Structure formats: structure tokens, C-alpha cells
Regions:
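VWA/integrin I-like adhesion module and closely mimicked acidic/polar interface patches used
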Residues: 138-179
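Von Willebrand factor A/integrin I-like adhesion domains
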Residues: 165, 169-226
């Protein structure tokens, strides 16, 4: 069993078995102390819904790759779930506590994307432009986060990545907006499940270059606060 698990983690074997074009998607999640209680519970429910929705989509399950970056603790950043095809993704159970080092978390996301792009190239696997979803109920607490935000905007302007900043109730949208050239959105209440279902359908359409992709991208009424 140990040998089998080791083989499953070797990316070259993974790409040999599945050479489909990939759509990389990174979730940068604020798991600071203010997310304790119902917010973190609903976030975990949303991640579980994302797992099921992607696995139920035969095409997306083999084309979408996920990575989760957790911002928490004493300005700590953790790769909660490393790059994995959606078909093999298991939603982690997130726990809340500590501060909100969003700058460090977003830089980590950019670095992991660069590394994965190099891996795709070395394996002869094509890929769509990566997506990053930054989700927070507050604002950055780490020193130098403005520099990290500038790196994010630069990467997006140069078409290396698409970044969406999503704020829940209480989030400082003015500061979250600095991480993207796109306007930030605010989640209605704790509608994490509705948001992640939208995300799943959107990345699925993008991964398949579906003609109705823009329809799903633009229709955010189920979770976006007007």
C-alpha cells in the first residue's frame, strides 16, 4: 500500500495516465480566529460541495487541478492541500485561529503556480491560465502585504493568472481589492456552498472551453451581495 501511495504522488506518472490540458485553481483561505464557529463550519461545507460537484463532472474531474493555501496563526501560511486533480481531491477540514497573513499566502500561491507551470511544461502538458480565489472575512495583517498585492496585480496584468478577491461579512474590501485588477465581490451571509458550486461550474466550463463559460462566470446572483 505504501508503494502504491508513493507512485500516486509522482506527478510524471499522474500526467502519463492523464495527459488532459489542466486548469489550475488555487484557493487562498482566511482561517483566522474571526472565522471560528459558524463561518468555518460553512466554509468546510462549501469545500465538501466543491469536491462532490467536480467529481461528478467527468471532464472537469480530470482537467481541473486544485491547491489550497491556508492563512492563519502567527502570520503562518500552510499548503493545506497540494496540487491534485479534482478526481482525487478530498476536501480538508479547516480550523480557524490566529491572524490573517494574506500577503504571504498570495505570494505562496503565485510561487506554487510558477512551479506547477514548469512541471506542466516539462511533462508536455498544456494548461489554461490559473485562477486564484482569495477569500477573507477581514484584511491582511502581515508586514509588507502591499508589496505582495502589487506582485499579484502585476501577474494578472501580464496575463499569468486570474485573481478574484471575495470578502465575507466584515471584510475590508478596499484592502482586498489591492490584490486584483478585478473588483472584489462580497459574499451574501455565509453562502460558501453557493459560492463553491458556482466556482465548480465556472472552472468546469473554462477547462472544457465551453461556449457558455461567460454565462456561468457572470451569473453570481446566488452568492454575491448586491
Amino acid at each position: 500500500m505504501a508503494e502504491q501511495n508513493t507512485i500516486e504522488r509522482i506527478p510524471y506518472v499522474e500526467f502519463a495516465d492523464n495527459a488532459n490540458e489542466r486548469t489550475p485553481c488555487v484557493l487562498v483561505l482566511d482561517c483566522s480566529g474571526s472565522m471560528r464557529g459558524e463561518p468555518i463550519k460553512q466554509l468546510n461545507a462549501g469545500l465538501a460541495a466543491l469536491e462532490k460537484e467536480l467529481k461528478d463532472d467527468i471532464d472537469a474531474s480530470s482537467r481541473v487541478q486544485l491547491l489550497i493555501v491556508k492563512a492563519f496563526g502567527k502570520d503562518e501560511v500552510k499548503i493545506e492541500s497540494d496540487w491534485i486533480d479534482a478526481m482525487n481531491f478530498t476536501a480538508p477540514t479547516m480550523e480557524a485561529g490566529g491572524l490573517t497573513p494574506l500577503g504571504k499566502a498570495m505570494e505562496t500561491a503565485l510561487q506554487k503556480i510558477d512551479e506547477q507551470k514548469c512541471l506542466y511544461d516539462s511533462c508536455g502538458v498544456t494548461s489554461k491560465r490559473p485562477w486564484i480565489f482569495l477569500i477573507s472575512d477581514g484584511e491582511p495583517t502581515d508586514y509588507g502585504w502591499e508589496d505582495s498585492a502589487e506582485l499579484c496585480r502585476y501577474a494578472q496584468k501580464n496575463k499569468k493568472v486570474v485573481i478574484h478577491a471575495i470578502g465575507t461579512q466584515g471584510a475590508n474590501l478596499e484592502k482586498l481589492a489591492k490584490f486584483s485588477i478585478l473588483p472584489p465581490k462580497r459574499l451574501t451571509g455565509l453562502k460558501f456552498t453557493e459560492f463553491f458550486l458556482w466556482l465548480s461550474r465556472s472552472v468546469s466550463c473554462i477547462s472544457k472551453a465551453a461556449p457558455n463559460a461567460n454565462k456561468y462566470l457572470d451569473d453570481i446572483t446566488e452568492w454575491n451581495e448586491k
